[in-house]
């Protein structure tokens, strides 16, 4: 959940999307497994119910930030795209799908759906979605990409996906380029 991590991606994208505002927040909590990092919610030693409860708190915070950015910059929700890595992807999916005012897109890297039953019961919009995941990810296994794809297909979403070869828990150049092309196609 470090904003500086995703800001590296934003710096690359900014070159090709010059009229785009990038907001790269830190997640709201200090990371439970690292003194220097941040997290949207604690995944360690938590029950499924506790993870959902904590993710709902994070979702409120992200929604508040989205609404502030929209108001401050005189934007419409259709001009908003969320992008996240790992937990950032997870909270972007949950928040973006549940928003009543549909955002444009979600670019997700190495994440998963936090709680499919909860999300199934709270679908409010259908943003454009691309999910990417490394085939060698040992932090968030690639099987979660396949589960998310199945969820979205079952719920009549058109979702793009890419399994990145020989990639661990990170965003490789190929992934950043695919995310950029996806945003160019959907935002402009």
List where the protein language model places each region:
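Serine-hydrolase catalytic machinery in alpha/beta-hydrolase-like enzymes
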Residues: 1-75, 79
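Short alpha-helix in the alpha/beta-hydrolase fold that links the catalytic acid
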Residues: 6-11, 141-151
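Active-site signature of alpha/beta-hydrolase-fold catalytic machinery across serine-
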Residues: 8, 94-98
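Short beta-strand immediately N-terminal to the catalytic nucleophile in serine-hydrolase-like folds
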Residues: 82-84, 109, 132
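Gly/Ala-rich beta-loop-alpha elbow adjacent to hydrolase catalytic centers
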Residues: 84-88, 92
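A conserved short beta-strand
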Residues: 101-113
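Short beta-strand/loop motif that positions the catalytic acidic residue
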Residues: 130-133, 137
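C-terminal catalytic histidine-bearing segment of alpha/beta-hydrolase fold enzymes
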Residues: 146-188
């Amino acid at each position: 959940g470090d904003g500086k991590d995703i800001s590296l991606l934003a710096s690359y994208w900014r070159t090709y999307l010059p009229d785009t505002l990038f907001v790269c927040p830190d997640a709201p909590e200090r990371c439970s497994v690292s003194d220097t990092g941040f997290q949207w919610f604690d995944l360690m030693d938590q029950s499924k119910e506790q993870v959902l409860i904590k993710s709902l708190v994070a979702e409120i915070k992200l929604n508040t930030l989205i609404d502030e950015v929209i108001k401050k910059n005189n934007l419409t929700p259709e001009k908003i795209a969320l992008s996240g890595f790992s937990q950032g992807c997870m909270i972007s999916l949950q928040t973006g799908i549940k928003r009543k005012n549909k955002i444009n897109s979600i670019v997700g890297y190495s994440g998963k759906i936090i709680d499919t039953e909860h999300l199934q019961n709270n679908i409010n919009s259908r943003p454009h979605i691309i999910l990417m995941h490394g085939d060698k990810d040992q932090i968030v296994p690639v099987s979660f990409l396949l589960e998310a794809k199945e969820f979205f297909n079952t719920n009549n979403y058109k979702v793009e996906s890419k399994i990145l070869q020989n990639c661990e828990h990170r965003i490789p150049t190929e992934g950043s380029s695919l995310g950029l092309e996806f945003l160019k196609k959907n935002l402009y």
